[in-house]
Curated annotation (Swiss-Prot):
Stated family: Belongs to the GTP cyclohydrolase II family.
UniProt catalytic activity: GTP + 4 H2O = 2,5-diamino-6-hydroxy-4-(5-phosphoribosylamino)-pyrimidine + formate + 2 phosphate + 3 H(+)
Cofactor: Zn(2+)
EC numbers for this chain: 3.5.4.25
Originating organism: Pseudomonas putida (strain ATCC 47054 / DSM 6125 / CFBP 8728 / NCIMB 11950 / KT2440)
Binding site for Zn(2+): C54, C65, C67
Residue intervals passing through the bilayer: none
Molecular-function GO term, any one: GTP binding
Range of residues in the leader sequence: none
Protein name, entry field: GTP cyclohydrolase-2
């Protein structure tokens, strides 16, 4: 996987001053970022998150998803721990891109769920590729994670790459009336582990 390290700098945030590591995927031209805090190369499991880019949720405060809340909660958790890593992956819209995500939102406004919308546009329900994470984690010396996620695909992807997932740390945040159906679909159709409040809420055909 031709993902190469480019540069690193300090990044002060309201939560902590992180080190920001920039990486380039030479195959796609996509630029990815890792935020790290503390000694993450000591061989002990590192609190971490794989966070896929979500412009609408992360930067525009959208309540259609829980992405922005999860990003903030993950950074806060790392800051509290004093040690951790967050991989910010440029895989907008579960890998379909921003404009296609807006097209998918348009279909959702017409009644489709998040999976149906992607499929109607000719995409898989989730097109993200986590193989790009391996060279970034190797560069940083991270071999074991306490992974903040509700998504079992992320756990499997890391395990398949021989990255130890020592613990799955749930991220239950960002629930609101606007994303109730979206979260139910993620639980019912994508297998996300979101708790009993979202199980069985997906309308049956």
């Amino acid at each position: 996987m031709p993902v190469v390290f480019v540069a690193a700098s300090k990044l002060p945030t309201p939560f902590a001053t992180f080190t920001m590591h920039g990486f380039l995927d030479e195959a796609t031209g996509r630029e990815h970022v890792v935020l790290s805090l503390g000694d993450i190369a000591d061989g002990q499991p590192v609190l971490g998150r794989l966070h896929s880019e979500c412009l609408t949720g992360d930067a525009l405060f959208s309540q259609r998803c829980d992405c922005g809340s999860q990003l903030e909660a993950a950074l806060q958790a790392i800051a509290r721990e004093g040690r951790g890593v967050l991989l910010y992956l440029r895989q907008e819209g579960r890998g379909i891109g921003l404009l296609n995500k807006i097209r998918a939102y348009e279909l959702q406004d017409g009644g489709a769920d998040t999976v149906e919308a992607n499929e109607r546009l000719g995409f898989a329900a989730d097109q993200r590729d986590y193989a790009i994470c391996l060279p970034m984690l190797e560069h940083l010396g991270v071999k074991s994670l306490r992974l903040m996620t509700n998504n079992p695909r992320k756990v499997k992807a890391l395990t398949d790459m021989n990255i130890v997932v020592a613990e799955r740390v749930p991220l239950h945040t960002g629930h609101n009336p606007h994303n109730r159906y979206y979260l139910a679909t993620k639980a019912g159709k994508l297998g996300h582990m979101l708790g009993n409040e979202h199980q069985g809420e997906v309308p049956q055909a």
